[in-house]
Amino acid sequence: MRTVYLLISLALSVPVAALADEAAENEARLLSSTRQLTFAGKRAGEGYFSADGSKMIFQSEREKDNPFFQIYLIDLETGDTERISPGHGKTTCAWIHPGGKKVMFASTHSDPDARKKQEEALKRRAEGKEKRYSWDYDAFFDIYEYDLETKKSRNLTR
C-alpha cells in the first residue's frame, strides 16, 4: 500500500513542479522592470497612479508619533512627496481623481480617540507586542475629498 501512495505522490509532484516553474517565469517576465518609488518611513503600501501617470498616491508610516498609515502624493518626475492626510488617525484607500485636481481617501482622524489609539499602538510596539497586519474595521472611517490646489479637505460621508 505504501508503494501505491509513493507512486501517486511522485506522479502528482511532476505536473505541480512544472506549474510552479511556469508561474515563476511569468512573474519574472511581468516584474522585470520594477523599481522602488518610496524610500522614507517604516513601511509603505497600496499605491495608485494618476490618470496621466505623473503622480502616485500611496499610504506610508512616516510620522514618528503615529504608527498608522498616512496618505502621501509623490510627483514621479521630481520625487517631491507631500502628505495629504492630516497626520493623525488611520488612513487607507486613497485615489486620485482623473482630473488630477482632487484626491479621496478614508481616514479616522475625526475619531475623538484617534491620538489615544496611536499612543496605545506605539506602547504595544515598544513592548514588543506589535500586532500582525490586519485590516481592522473602524467605525470612525470616513471618506474625505482633498483639493490639491486649496489644500483643504471635506468629509463626504457626514
Where are these regions (language model features)?
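Bacterial N-terminal signal peptides
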Residues: Y5-P15
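Boundary at the C-terminal end of the N-terminal hydrophobic targeting segment
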Residues: A18-E22
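Multi-bladed beta-propeller domains
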Residues: E25-K42, I74-K90, Y146-R158
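A flexible loop/linker signature enriched in serine peptidases of the S9 family
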Residues: F39-K42, Q59-Q70, P86-T91, A106-I143, ...
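Residue-level detector of Asp-centered blade-edge/turn motifs that repeat once per structural unit
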Residues: A51-D52, P98-G99
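Hydrophobic beta-strand positions that form the internal "hydrophobic ladder"
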Residues: G53-I57, V103-M104
